[in-house]
Amino acid sequence: MNIGLIGCGNMARAMARGWGRPVLCFDPVAERAQALAQEMGGKALGSNAEVAARADLVVLCHKPAQLGRIAAEVAPAAKAVASILAATPLAKLKSAYPDIPVYRFLPSLPAEVRGGAIVQASDPRREPESADTPIDTEVRELFAELGTLVVLDDSLVDVAMGLMSCAPAYVALVVEAQVDAGTRRGIPPAQASVLVTATLAGTAELLRRRDYDTLAVRREVTSPGGVTARGLAALERGGLRAAFDDALDAVLGEQR
């Protein structure tokens, strides 16, 4: 499958690196497209329409506000389209690309290392018993290469964005805070970074193997009245749960 990228920003680069194969691409900043094509062994093309004509699957990585303008250039020649645009539901995408297969995915930056989660939006208009077409299967398998694929109702994809697409920045901040705390108490920053990130990666794998039972893992680490219990109590007093809830509200633009 020839993959064509419309836009060569951070997420487009992460996906291309995760796929590890040549891509066709276009970006208004020509240097970005050229750099990505050179890195991946692909080709930077001269227009959105040229990408559409040469790709088997066009992946929309542009700004959401550009949907109508870019669809006017891409739709006449595109064979299939996958969108990673935020706050752009399937109905709106299908309206812009009415005569071809259209898919909506939500990746996150760890796609670069084939890690993290990838959300696929389920089509609310599709009959439950309808079978996947060959292109449906090929596109789903392509994005599943980038991480753990989770299918959600289209209406929930933007909520998922606050949980996983934004989460690498949140996790990086948590790591930074832990490293800073250790550094202030004498551990060199390089060693503190290794300690925290290795523990984070190991805990994520442990949770996967324990069927995501966070309570069970916490109980194994936490002895009554012990140091971990005191640390957890301090985090709760500091409003850790409320902070993450507020962050999700901020992402969704909600007011409470």
What are these language model-derived features?
Residues M1-G46, E50-L57, A96, G115, ...:
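NAD(P)+-binding Rossmann beta1-loop-alpha1 motif at the extreme N-terminus of oxidoreductases
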Residues P22, A55, A78, I100, ...:
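Short, well-ordered alpha-helix to beta-strand connector turns
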Residues S130, T197-R256:
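NAD(P)-dependent Rossmann-like dehydrogenase/reductase catalytic/cofactor-binding core
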Residues A33, V51, L67, P188-L195, ...:
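Small-residue helix-packing motif on alpha-helices
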Residues S47-Y97:
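Rossmann-fold NAD(P) dinucleotide-binding segment
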Residues E39, K92-P101, A117-V159, V171-R209, ...:
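Internal alpha-helical scaffold of NAD(P)-dependent oxidoreductase catalytic cores
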